[in-house]
């Protein structure tokens, strides 16, 4: 599934209804008293998080949203009805910004959370509201105020339990297609995956783990190299990381060096990112001529405090061990969240 993680929309709140100029037509009431009602308030535009939504895809096709206007006042002191609020639903995890100023208006992190992004205009007062002891028959009323309008930027921080990181072509897309039903486009060149892909790994005991294939990082990503900032943004809300390394050709890049380069980019972007639990996965062992490398890497990463598993996504070797490790890490994360 292709994820669109940014959208720009225009919102316009409803205008307030106009106040009415009217007079009573009653017998024995000299000149008739003022009876113009007030206009109704315009509807607000509200953005609300909805857990059933997963993407910002709908905003590709519809970019303009307008709430209902307030109705005008009328005679016999009848006030206009308020305009209905317009509720725009977005996925949980959406950050709402003012597109012009960049100000964050809300970070919608739980289901049902709302933010008013454009307030409806106030209704105008009818002439009955202007009656005074010195002006018994005012012949004027107020117009309703226009509703607020502005451009809004929506940014979806992909919410997944575990993110798969690594250099382009480390095998991340293949892993997510093997672990889940997702079928990302896979080809043998860097930056094949240009948008994050979500996959779901079903565990034996009925639970499921949402895994995000984060597009390949490169050296300099924290400074915006390649599509660095776009990619790093997606990692922030994952609870743990699968760090994939291609160990088939050490002449091209040393596995330890590859691991350190990516981790340095994470740390430069946000020191919190490198504190996340990481499972290191050495991929493409079916292409290894010397398998002693697997034990060496296992010991090296163990010293650094990271679990290591070697796999071949072609032959499926090591996959069961990896799934078991993912389940263990997920359980630890879940236990910590329960304690919190």
Swiss-Prot record:
Its cofactor is Mg(2+). Residues 1-159 form the Obg domain. GO terms for molecular function: GTP binding; GTPase activity; magnesium ion binding. Its EC number is 3.6.5.-. It comes from the Bacteria. CDD domains: Obg. Coiled coil: none annotated. Its main location: cytoplasm. Mg(2+) binds at residues 173, 193. GTP binds at residues 166-173, 191-195, 213-216, 283-286, 312-314. One of its GO terms (cellular component) is cytoplasm. Gene3D superfamilies: GTP1/OBG domain, P-loop containing nucleotide triphosphate hydrolases. It is found in: Cytoplasm. Keywords: Cytoplasm, GTP-binding, Hydrolase, Magnesium, Metal-binding, Nucleotide-binding. The keyword Nucleotide-binding applies. Belongs to the TRAFAC class OBG-HflX-like GTPase superfamily. OBG GTPase family. An essential GTPase which binds GTP, GDP and possibly (p)ppGpp with moderate affinity, with high nucleotide exchange rates and a fairly low GTP hydrolysis rate. Plays a role in control of the cell cycle, stress response, ribosome biogenesis and in those bacteria that undergo differentiation, in morphogenesis control. NCBIfam families: Obg_CgtA, PRK12296.1, PRK12297.1, PRK12299.1, small_GTP. This is GTPase Obg. It comes from Persephonella marina (strain DSM 14350 / EX-H1).
């Amino acid at each position: 599934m292709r994820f669109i993680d940014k959208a720009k929309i225009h919102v316009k709140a409803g205008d307030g209804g106009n106040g009415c100029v009217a007079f009573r037509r009653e017998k024995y009431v000299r000149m008739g008293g003022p009876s113009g009602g007030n206009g109704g308030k315009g509807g607000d535009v509200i953005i609300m998080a909805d857990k059933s939504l997963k993407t910002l895809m709908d905003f590709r096709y519809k970019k303009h949203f307008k709430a209902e206007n307030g109705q005008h006042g009328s005679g016999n002191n009848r006030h206009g009805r308020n305009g209905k609020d317009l509720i725009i639903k977005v996925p949980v995890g959406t950050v709402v910004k003012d597109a012009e100023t960049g100000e964050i208006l809300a970070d919608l992190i739980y289901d049902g959370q709302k933010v008013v992004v454009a307030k409806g205009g106030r209704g105008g007062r009818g002439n009955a509201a202007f009656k005074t002891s010195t002006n018994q028959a005012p012949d004027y009323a107020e117009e309703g105020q226009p509703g607020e309008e502005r451009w809004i930027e929506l940014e979806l921080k992909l919410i997944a339990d575990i993110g798969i990181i690594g250099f382009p072509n480390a095998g991340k897309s293949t892993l997510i297609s093997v672990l889940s039903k997702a079928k990302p486009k896979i080809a043998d060149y860097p930056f094949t995956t240009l948008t994050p892909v979500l996959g779901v790994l079903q565990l034996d005991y009925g639970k499921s783990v949402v895994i995000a294939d984060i597009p390949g990082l490169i050296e300099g990503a924290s400074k915006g190299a390649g599509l660095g900032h776009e990619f790093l943004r997606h990692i922030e809300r994952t609870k743990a990381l699968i760090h994939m390394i291609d160990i088939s050709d050490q002449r091209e890049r040393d596995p330890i060096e590859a691991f350190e380069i990516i981790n340095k980019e994470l740390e430069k972007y946000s020191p919190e990112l490198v504190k996340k639990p990481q499972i290191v996965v050495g991929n493409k062992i079916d292409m290894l001529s010397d398998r002693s490398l697997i034990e060496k890497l296992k010991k090296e990463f163990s010293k650094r405090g990271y679990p290591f598993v070697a796999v071949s996504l072609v032959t499926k070797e090591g996959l069961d061990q990896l799934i078991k490790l993912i389940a263990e890490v997920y359980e630890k994360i879940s236990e910590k969240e329960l304690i919190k």
